[in-house]
Amino acid sequence: MSSHIQIFDTTLRDGEQTPGVNFTFDERLRIALQLEKWGVDVIEAGFPASSTGSFKSVQAIAQTLTTTAVCGLARCKKSDIDAVYEATKDAAKPVVHVFIATSPIHLEHKLKMSQEDVLASIKEHVTYAKQLFDVVQFSPEDATRTELPFLVKCVQTAVDAGATVINIPDTVGYSYHDEYAHIFKTLTESVTSSNEIIYSAHCHDDLGMAVSNSLAAIEGGARRIEGTVNGIGERAGNAALEEVALALYVRNDHYGAQTALNLEETKKTSDLISRYAGIRVPRNKAIVGQNAFSHESGIHQDGVLKHRETYEIMTPQLVGVSTTELPLGKLSGKHAFSEKLKALGYGIDKEAQIDLFKQFKAIADKKKSVSDRDIHAIIQGSEHEHQALYKLETLQLQYVSSGLQSAVVVVKDKEGHIYQDSSIGTGSIVAIYNAVDRIFQKETELIDYRINSVTEGTDAQAEVHVNLLIEGKTVNGFGIDHDILQASCKAYVEAHAKFAAENVEKVGN
């Protein structure tokens, strides 16, 4: 019988530390709901003491989820622990995650503390946290660069103070397979407690070994894995949870352990995070990449046609990738469109389907067939526009002279107010973005601009991601349209709208 490996998702906390990623309040809530649907055991929803925005989003997630534990991060500070308590007290399963650095380099250069000071702080703050929470998780930050005897002392101190979950972070992705497994074996053999202690692994991918080390931790005695969807996170990112889960599923013969994830929700979860983070999943990414179940070699294709297991160790359906696609066309009616939405797993009410059907027909008039990916794109674009405080109403472009373009942009807010401005620039994109900047009355720096095609072919929809720096804050925007310039404008407007929403501003004169 397989043992249960808990999944601790930190996409909303560690994942959001990815450069350029800044989820909105609504996006955080939607992500949390999808993670619960995916079946994760614990969601680290944020760091409540870090900002009012983080506190409010953690609080909203705690009040919304019904089965998944909601965790908040706290330094060894009573005010941090209090903030987590206030944010998560309405959760079905509240958890606090207390941490302090323990490695020599952190003690000397960051904390300016002795080992004795650190041990005293662990005892004081874990004891305090235990008075407020049934479940306290403790992490010795930079554990893999901490002397093992001192690490054992830190963990024993935390356990004696009431921690029942011990997380061992490979904070800078420094460890390797055997070394990391040895740390867990040493702790499980050395630390004593009358309570059951769950050991957890938290690996970063600086040397490309986050998933491998996470699996090594299980071999060493870990019963919980921490990570993010698609492996997003600071620097090179975190362990990709979908890869860990599928490795355990496919190689259950070796690990004898399984997660409780609903694996069929994996692709949908990955796509959601990719869209909101503005980070496209690489085509060759394991499990969820576009090429994960593709076979180009003639020998491979022949083998798969004869028997799929010749070159596939898991099925696309296992992770929610459909392979029995029946495209729609311009003659497809409302009923066929509605049935397609159901088949793709969308529970959309009839009123919302009316607008989606109009968008579908507009695309169907321009394409021979509308694929499942087109349908997903329509819904994604609609969700973004529905959530936005402002959205693009119209865009007009005109060639002026000597390479100059003129752009007139009209934006509408949720109350129906119209904002319009125009500008000239060296090229269409510059003209459009100058006009939008004038509407929102903000100086911006365009950090990143990317165009992806939703499907193959010259008639594909365009998916545009932008990353802007506005008043020192990084925001991303996303736009989908059959016209690249329309998609580019939608993405830029959305980025401005996100900034305005986070700062509760109105635009225009």
From Swiss-Prot:
- The record's region (Regulatory domain) falls at 391-509
Cellular localisation: Cytoplasm
GO cellular component terms, A-Z: cytoplasm
Q: Where is the Pyruvate carboxyltransferase domain?
A: 5-267
Sites where the protein binds Mn(2+): D14, H202, H204, N238
Q: Which GO terms describe its biological process?
A: L-leucine biosynthetic process
Question: What Enzyme Commission number(s) apply to this enzyme?
Answer: 2.3.3.13
**InterPro entries, alphabetized:** 2-IPM_HCS-like, 2-isopropylmalate_synth_dimer, Aldolase_TIM, LeuA/HCS_post-cat, LeuA_allosteric_dom_sf, LeuA_bact_synth, PYR_CT
Protein name per the record: 2-isopropylmalate synthase
Natural source organism: Staphylococcus aureus (strain MW2)
